[in-house]
Amino acid sequence: MSPELEQFLNANASAIFGLLGALGGGVLSFVAALLLKRSEFSLQLRSKIVDRQIAAHERILKLAQEMRVMVSSGMLGADGEVARGPRILLSKDEFESWFTRFTEQQLEGSTWLTTATKREVAFVQDYLVTLHMHLADVPSEKCFDLAQLIRQDFIDLSNSLEKVAFAFFETGIHRARPDSLLDWHKYKRPVTEQRLTSTALLQNIAEFKGTLSKVPK
């Protein structure tokens, strides 16, 4: 180091260190502000994700609750009790309207549903599609007769759908991260077929249609 430079440094050491301190403090402040900004953005993003997940699962819970709303026909059933069935099967028009709304509602937020919820929703939809197909052969005035036979199906489907959707609020809500879209959204085919086969709908529909065919027109 040259004598001139050494002399300059000695004479201005305080100023130089003060300048370096100011620069260092400025850099640290900038870095801290940047990290804080990133943290705030991350929190805002997580909040938006959670809000959409909550809304999607709340829609499924509402649909599940609607499925188990029962109404009475005012007549006594074979067991001597007042016959009851799902309100959404009071008539074909009632079912068509609700089925359309079910499809629209579950699609609206399907991206934000947990994989488990998607699979149960898909199974319920398979059941409803099967029911819709069979209703084509059932007069609207006989729709509620079928509803009474498959009442337990709607109770079971409602409970299973509600259970899997509510599980998100118990555990998934704390993750603030949606499940992968690469996960298959349906149960394996043997599982779906076995569950459908065990429903009151598929166990009773042939006999029910047979009874209808014997009714004088």
Show which residues each predicted segment covers:
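Conserved non-transmembrane functional hotspots
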Residues: 31-217
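Membrane-embedded hydrophobic alpha-helical segments
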Residues: 1-44
